[in-house]
């Protein structure tokens, strides 16, 4: 019985550590990521709004490690190719912290953008109008 309880507790701990992020977390991460995209890629207001929604949808869809580079990641990148100009999309793909914004290591989710922009409270632009 003790062994079963131990296994269940370990399974629950593993499941909780790899759970999807909350809506609030996804919203904050999408805002930070999109703000830096707007700064580096010189996005217009319409592109900024659309990129925020795309990033938020992607972050909300990631529930497991398998989702990182699965269908929603491909949809995200395809959507980005529709809203960005050719030179912007090439720059987007060349920057790993934009192209693959999220990774999972040692049981935790990590955002590559923070290696380039460590000040998490500094924003270049205002919030998008769709930011609720």
Features from the language model and the residues they span:
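Bacterial Sec-dependent N-terminal signal peptides
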Residues: 1-26
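Low-complexity segments
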Residues: 23-39, 45-132
């Amino acid at each position: 019985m003790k062994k079963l309880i131990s296994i269940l507790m370990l399974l629950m701990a593993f499941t909780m550590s790899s759970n999807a992020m909350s809506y609030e977390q996804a919203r904050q991460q999408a805002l930070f990521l999109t703000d830096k995209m707007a700064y580096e890629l010189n996005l217009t207001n319409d592109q900024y709004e659309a990129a925020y929604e795309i990033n938020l949808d992607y972050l909300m869809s990631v529930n497991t490690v398998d989702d990182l580079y699965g269908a929603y990641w491909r949809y995200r990148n395809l959507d980005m190719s529709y809203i960005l100009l050719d030179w912007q999309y090439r720059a987007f793909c060349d920057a790993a912290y934009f192209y693959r914004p999220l990774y999972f290591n040692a049981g935790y989710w990590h955002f590559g953008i923070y290696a380039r922009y460590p000040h998490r409270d500094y924003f270049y632009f205002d919030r998008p109008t769709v930011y609720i």
